[in-house]
Every structure is written in C-alpha cells, then in structure tokens.
Amino acid sequence: MPIKPVGWICGQVLKNFSGRIEGIQKVIMDLIDEFKDEFPTILRLSQSNQKREPMQKPSKIRMAIALAKINRGTLIQGLNSISRSSKSVAKLLQPQLACRLLELRAISHRLLKEVNAPRQPLYNIQVRKGSLFEIISFPAKTALTSIMCASYAALIYLTVCVNAVLEKIMKIFQEEESIRQNREESENFRNAFSEPVLSEPLFPEGEIKAKPYRSLPEKPDSISDRPKLPANKLSNKIQVLHSVFDQSAEMNE
C-alpha cells in the first residue's frame, strides 16, 4: 500500500468537510455557549456518583434545547458525513502507523547489529563513515518517527472521540423524538376522550311522531239540564268512563 503524506490526508479531510464547515461551526459554537458555564463544575465533580447524576440531567436537557433550535435535517446529515469521514480517516491512518512502526523497528535492529558488530581495522575508515553518519542521524530519525506516530495516534483517538460524541447526540435526538411522539399521542388520546361523539339515532326522524295530548273532556253545560239516569245505568256509565281514563293514561305513558 503506498504511503500518503500528511498534507494529502489533511487535504482530503478538508475536501470532505468543505460546504459543511459553516453548519458544523455553528453547531459547535451553540454547544460551547450552552456548556461553557458548566465546565468548572464538571471538573470538580469527582467525589461520588450521587453528585454526578443530578448534574447530568439538566445538561442533557440544555443540550436537547440547544439542538432543538437547529435544523435537524442538516445537522443529522452533517453528523453522518463527519462520522463517515472520520471512520475513513481512521482506516487510512491505521496502516500508515503500523508501517511507520515497522520502519522504526527495522532501523533499530539494523543499528543494534552495526553497534554489536566487530570493530573494523584502521585502513577501512571510509566504510565506517557511513555507519557513523547513521549513528549521528539516528536520534533525529527516531524523534521524527515518534512525532509522526504520536500525531497519527492523536488523530485516531480524536476520530474515536468524535464518533462517541456523535453517537451520544444521535441518542439524545432519538429520545427527544420518541418523547415528542408519545406526548402527541397522549394529547390526541385526551382530545378523543374529551370530545363526546354523538351516536346516530336508532330511528330516523321521519318515523318518530309525537302523539297528541289527550286532555280530559270538558264538562258540558247541558249535563245539568238532562234528566237523572237510574242507579244501574249510572254505575255502568262510571265504569265505562274509568276504563276510558285508564286507556288514555296507558297511551300517554
């Protein structure tokens, strides 16, 4: 695998992030504004887990409020692109770091062999000049390779930390979305039960007819003028009137 220089890697990273730097910078500045007051208190919290739990809840709430103000579509798209690019950078830097370590080990083995080799006679001074130059330049080479290895390791660690932060932010987004959906469902459920639904009538309006009220017949004035009936006929008339009243009462009920 050909070894790519660090400048080319940085160029590829900037090329992948071009067009999204402003949105990412805005998100980072919003997060810094939300959490800049809490950094001193977070650094002091190292005594017990009981003191840490109350501080994490408001910080999560503030993070959720800060992230809710940002456009979610662009933020999620930018986070996904950053995650993909960071993973690609980590995959690209891992073999280069291993190659540099192998080169350093080979140089150290060769130097040890040359140091432990038997001394050359005095007439072979020109051959020893090359080995002396390598001995003198070895500290510079080791320092340079160690700096490069440290920079590669720092970049890999940074990408891992960025991926962890992105995963936490995605989890917070998912929790907020689920809470919002549950709240909407509960509100819809309450509205459905608070507004009574009128059931359709069992009978159509055309078939329902009100029965006329039957009042008692008024006493005519001519009754007093009529002759009195015998007792038997009078009792029969009274029974007939009682039966009529009973039927009218049943019909009214």
From Swiss-Prot:
Leader peptide range in chain numbering: none
Transmembrane stretches, start-end: 144-166
Pfam families: SPATA9 (PF15824)
Disulphide connectivity of cysteines: none
Keywords associated with the record: Developmental protein, Differentiation, Membrane, Spermatogenesis, Transmembrane, Transmembrane helix
Gene Ontology cellular-component terms listed: membrane
Protein known as: Spermatogenesis-associated protein 9
